[in-house]
């Protein structure tokens, strides 16, 4: 049985869960890595998404990422979903929930602390990379904070906080908090190809 987890609810309430051994028990807006996207969207909608101008393809069309928004979402403003466009089962290899908010660092640390309780400590390595320069901002004024859970099976969960400069905000970008779950297959592909 899947353990239900909408990560940012953790910010507002305290709940207890069974310790999860891997990311298959981890859900973002009730979706999990390894599930078929067909459980949430019909095939025509998926095809429309992967053929849209806003979809981004990885090298050799191995994967495609697209934004998915739904009024049914309880926590996130939108999701980024990664699938293999040639897989007619449309298995989710990565899912990222994004919440647009200012001053996300404290909330990020709250989420990380709850995830440390949720996941079995023996199954992951934790790496914190706070206050890095955001690669797209050559001035160094925008910062990004990564908090990573690397699992023994090579899957990963990352909690990200973007604190953007005034110029980026004026250009229409938004500060945000994101939680991403990546399958071991996707993580292995990234290591080999990126």
Predicted regions and their residues:
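Compositionally biased P/S/T/G-rich terminal and signal peptide-adjacent segments
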Residues: 65-91
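Non-cytosolic coordination micro-motifs
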Residues: 20-63, 89-194
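Sec-dependent N-terminal signal peptides
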Residues: 4-17
